[in-house]
Amino acid sequence: MRRAWTLAAFAVFLLSLPAAAFAQSIPTLTDLPTGPRPDSWHIWNGTAIGLNGPVFGDLIKIYRKMPWGEGTTLLTSDSHWRYGIHNTACAVFDRPAVLLGVSPLLILDVDVHYGPEIDYIYNNFSSLRDKYFPQHLPPSTGHTHIVQHAQANTVFKIGVGPVAALTLNDFDYFKNNEPYFNWDVATIIKEGFVFRSKTMLLFEFMKDWRFMLDYQNIRYFETGWRNESAGAGFLVMNPAWNHIMVISQLNYYIHNPDFKGLLFWSAVVMEWDFPDKR
C-alpha cells in the first residue's frame, strides 16, 4: 500500500509548469475582443497524468480579470490585471495560494503566488545529501506538515502563421526547518530557490491541431540537482467547448538522477469566463 500511494501520487512537478500559464498561452485570435471590455470572473482547471515518474494532480485557478484600455491592437487586445486564488492538489499534498498577475501584452503573462504547501505524507532527512529512492521512501512521520512557498512565473509567447513558440518559467522559493522530500520538485530540499523552465515549439498542421517539440529543465540551486528532458507531442484545442485543450507528449530524460528513459505526460485543460453584466 505504501508503494502504491507513492507511485500513484508522486510528483505533480510536471503539472505546475504548463498548467500555471496555459490560460493565456494560445489565444484564438478571432475570439479576442476589441473596444472596452467588462471585468469578469475566470475559472481555469488543468488535470495531468504521467508515467516515469508517475504524475496525477490537478491545478485550479479562480481569479478576477480586470481589462484595461480599448484593445484596439492585437498586442493589447487582452491586456488585464488579475487577482484570485489557486490550488495545486494531489493525494500527498495541497498548495493553496493567493495570486496576483498582469498581462500587459498578448505575448507576456506575469504572476506571483504565495501560500502554504500542506504535505499529507511528510518524509524528513538528516541532510540534503542523503541517499533516497523516490519509489521507496522511508516511513512518513505520520503527521501533516506545512512548508512556506512563494512563486513567480512568466510566460512569453510569439507566433507567425502556423508556427508558435512558448517559454514558461517558474521561480519557486521553499522554506522548511529541516531537509524533506518535496513531492513537487521530486527531490530532497530544505530552503532556497527552484527554477523550472519549459519551452515549446508548436506547428499547426490543421485547424486547432498542433505538433509540439518540448524541452524542460528543473534545477534546485542549493544542491545542484537538475531534471532535463526533451521530446515531442500533440496539442488539440476546441475553443467552442469551454476552451478545452488536450496535451500529450513523450519526452526522453537527458539528465535525471532518479529516472531514466522515456517519460509520458498528458493533461486536459478547460476554462470558463463570466463577464459582468453591463
Where are these regions (language model features)?
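Bacterial N-terminal signal peptides
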Residues: 8-18
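Short glycine/proline- and aromatic-enriched beta-strand/turn motifs that initiate or cap beta-hairpins
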Residues: 23-73, 78-80, 84-88, 271-278
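Outer membrane beta-barrel
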Residues: 75-123
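Bacterial N-terminal signal peptides that target proteins for export
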Residues: 1-8
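Generic detector of solvent-exposed, compositionally biased contiguous segments
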Residues: 55-59, 218-220, 229
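Outer-membrane pore/translocation modules
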Residues: 23-44, 105-207, 215, 224-241, ...
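Conserved active-site beta-strand-loop modules that form the wall/rim of enzyme catalytic pockets
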Residues: 210
